[in-house]
Amino acid sequence: MKQRLSLAQSALEKLSARRGNTWYPIFHLAPPAGWMNDPNGLIYFNGRYHAFFQHHPASAYQGPMHWGHATSTDMLHWQHELVALAPGDKYDRDGCFSGSAVDDDGVLSLIYTGHICLEDRGNDSIIREVQCLATSHDGIRFEKQGCVLTPPEGIMHFRDPKVWHEDGSWWMVIGARDASDNGQVLLYRGTSLRDWHLEHVLAHSAAGESYMWECPDFFRCGNFHWLMFSPQGMNPSGYRFRNLFQSGVLAGNWKPGSVFALKGVFEELDYGHDFYAPQSMLAEDGRRIIMAWMNMWDSPVPTRSEAWAGCLTLPREVFERDGRLCQRPVREVESLRRKCQPLSPVRLHGVQLLTENVQAAELLVTWHTVDSHAEHYGIRLGEGLRFYVDNQAGRLILWRYYPEEGLDGYRSVELPDTEYLTLRIFLDRSSVEVFVNDGEATLSSRIYPQADSRQLSLYAAHGDAILTDGTLWMLT
């Protein structure tokens, strides 16, 4: 593998030399160049946070999957490390697909899916997927240990292992597609990272509901266990499931040796255009943190012209509130704040310019919804992004319009039935993330404003809106 890693690193360095920065993020993790998708192997290990990710170092297009690697002390300022894994062995010939990382008695261990195309590359109707192990004593350079788990009889799609240690055993959840083309998550138990046996199917889709459940994660938070996964093949329903693929959670009760007793239905984790394959880790202080890929399959990728593609969301702390899994930005984001601009309370009618040129910012605003009678009101960035309250529809709308990049359309969530609406909005060069009422809902989307279209404004149309409080920070 050493030669393949060297070639991958060399290709990445050559591509990095011509990377453009028009839309390259200031405070989100993105590849130094090349392609990025799923976050992998999120872990706090030996005093640093590690984020691995699906990566093609040779181009800004999806290719044979490698594992990129970055480390941080605060989950915000990332240092890119050497490419961690490169495909090419008999068990991962066509890709080192997604997986997780654990601390095995001081050894940083990666458990990942080895992907093999049995016919043409890219034809996923005839593939073989197995689970593999790689280990490192310094946390940077990894040695492959080979295949440690093969799929059950009759299962071809078998990927994205998430591993943890509990009750004296190793546990693993894996996404799968059964013989009837229904998604499911399999639960395994191990005496070591090399010795596994199947416990049972932890959860599965209803017949015809979705054909594959990718990137599962399983953890306790608050009063419930949460199965987090990314189903493929769900049909749109009203305002729901509008992206090509979804990501969300099932809540229930579980303990080692028991079944997962569901307590509700599948709930999406994010309602924007771009959120997929979230993975969790425990922070140094025990907070449960998730990060996701902030893109969507089959969406336009304008940054390819700048030799890079893909980024991750802000790290988010998840917590349970009234039986729902909520998200808020990790408190470390406050360290990014620089220039502070308080916003005075105002009865807004028309447009109020906040700043002429936003590269990276956090906007915190509170609206008095009961006395805000405008047809719609909120924020806008240039001519291409609006996030607003639609009083007639009773919804919060995230609308983006970049026709030159092939992007147009909106996503939305129901307007909370509260007297006050608090929005915490993070803008980076090519992304927006909105947190509604301290994590009650989130919306994440990629945006592509031109240099002359970064004016940030508040507005109210066809009536007044009452802003009760607000602050704008520039971020670095």
Curated annotation (Swiss-Prot):
Belongs to the glycosyl hydrolase 32 family. CDD domains: GH32_FFase (cd08996). Homodimer. Its EC number is 3.2.1.26. The active site is at 38. May prevent the potential hasard of excessive sucrose accumulation. It comes from the Bacteria. It is an enzyme of class 3 (hydrolase). Keywords: Glycosidase, Hydrolase, Plasmid. InterPro entries: ConA-like_dom_sf, GH32_Enzymes, Glyco_hydro_32, Glyco_hydro_32_AS, Glyco_hydro_32_C, Glyco_hydro_32_N, Glyco_hydro_beta-prop_sf, Suc6P_hydrolase. This is Raffinose invertase.
